[in-house]
């Protein structure tokens, strides 16, 4: 999709989208789920992280496989979540794990075949632990106010800056990030590689 067509549809600029990792949530999709995934992939984001963490592994693998097919059609990297075995069966070498699962699988030496191992961190201590465990990417949050974390104050850009200064791997911001608000520019100025966006990308 060219810049002119994107502008006509009121979509964000492709330069911004190249710094966005889309986090999926089928419960928020504005249209049928795979149709929404296709729309997202047409925008060429940095990656699509198939979160859907409420699913058991068999159901997750089935759905993630459908998302993967769309991602491959548009040459958008696809990152699986929670289930490394499902990822490997699908030929995916990128996984995002909660910190507790990263520790579990790293101790079991189950992550050797992955080139990308991401995890979420919410404190400096967690970031240090994730780096010790060999994470190749950190997601730090939540940075801004978000309905996904109702009642919890955001950690803010000072926290993001601290994690970016600490880490020798890419750090992605997450939580309450909206395009067209100046937030992307703000998180990039903190040293982040980009921003993870769920709600807005599931409704775009």
How would you describe each model-predicted region?
Residues 18-24, 48-50, 78-80, 95-97, ...:
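Hydrophobic faces of well-ordered beta-strands that scaffold small-molecule active sites
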Residues 1-36, 109:
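N-terminal amphipathic alpha-helix/helix-capping segment at the start of soluble metabolic enzymes
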Residues 22, 98-108, 137-151, 176-204:
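Glycine-rich phosphate-binding active-site loops on the catalytic face of alpha/beta enzymes
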Residues 37-44, 69-73, 88, 108-112, ...:
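Acidic (Asp/Glu)-rich catalytic clusters
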Residues 47-59, 142-149:
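Glycine-rich, proline-tolerant flexible connector loops at the mouths of alpha/beta enzymes
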Residues 78-93, 122-135, 166-197:
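Catalytic cores of alpha/beta
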Residues 61-80, 99-102, 107-123, 153-178:
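Alpha-helix-loop-beta-strand connector modules within alpha/beta enzyme cores
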Residues 90, 94, 118-165, 204:
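Glycine/Thr-rich beta-alpha phosphate-binding loop at enzyme active sites
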